[in-house]
Amino acid sequence: MKLSLSQPCSFSGALLLLAVSNLLVWEKVTSLPNYRLPTESLYQRVIVVSHNAHDLASKAFMEFEMKFGRTAWTYGLMLSPCHTAAILTPENSEQVHQTTSEDLLKVSITILQAWEEPLKHMVAAVAALPHVPDTLLSRTKELEERIQGLLEGLKIIFNRVYPGAVASDYTFWSAWSDLQSSDESTKNSALRTLWRCVRRDTHKVDNYLKVLKCRDVHNNNC
């Protein structure tokens, strides 16, 4: 029996329609290169990519902990500071909302730029791990791609909204030698620190972008 359009949809049917609708919107957004997208659509894209990047970082961190966490902890019980700790960032909701949109974009770009070099080394280091799960390696590679795409999108938004302004360039990272160490504990401890920090930093950027979209796309009506 066919349902007429006037009949109410089931809950599962409504969810399916919503999922298909979201998929069609996303396909429309992702079918264009970043530079051709309207700013509102570009914000939509970077929000999705940002959330996906944080999800990848979180899952990869947990997978690394389960597989290699024990050898990472034997190197030392003290947590090493993140290499991005020197970047001044708003740390709580009040500070975020007191920070201008320009500065939130700047700090988001700075954080992502600081991960370009480490992620390249992380891919190589993870690939060299003994009996590394395929899922961990694929997530590491995909995270690098997501960060690059997110950085590209944010730079386009920044240059459109604040033409002539300059975002800070932060690329300092000095722990690459630990990833190349012949000592298993040293190498795994360095990887564990990087996974913990990239999970933290992608979460920060994800939160900043949600605030920016609310301000700049929805005029704080969200």
From Swiss-Prot:
Keyword Secreted annotated: yes
PROSITE patterns assigned to the protein according to its UniProt record, in alphabetical order: SOMATOTROPIN_1, SOMATOTROPIN_2
Record localization: Secreted
GO molecular function: hormone activity
CDD domains listed in its UniProt record: prolactin_like (cd10288)
Principal cellular location given in the protein's record: secreted
Family matches, as InterPro entries: 4_helix_cytokine-like_core, Somatotropin/Prolactin, Somatotropin_CS
Pfam families (alphabetical): Hormone_1 (PF00103)
Cystine pairings recorded for this chain: 82-197, 214-222
GO cellular component: extracellular space
Signal sequence extent: 1-31
UniProt keyword annotations, A-Z: Disulfide bond, Hormone, Secreted, Signal
Family statement drawn from the similarity comment of this UniProt entry: Belongs to the somatotropin/prolactin family.
Protein name listed in UniProt: Prolactin-3B1
Naturally occurring in which organism (per UniProt): Mus musculus (Mouse)
Gene designation: Prl3b1
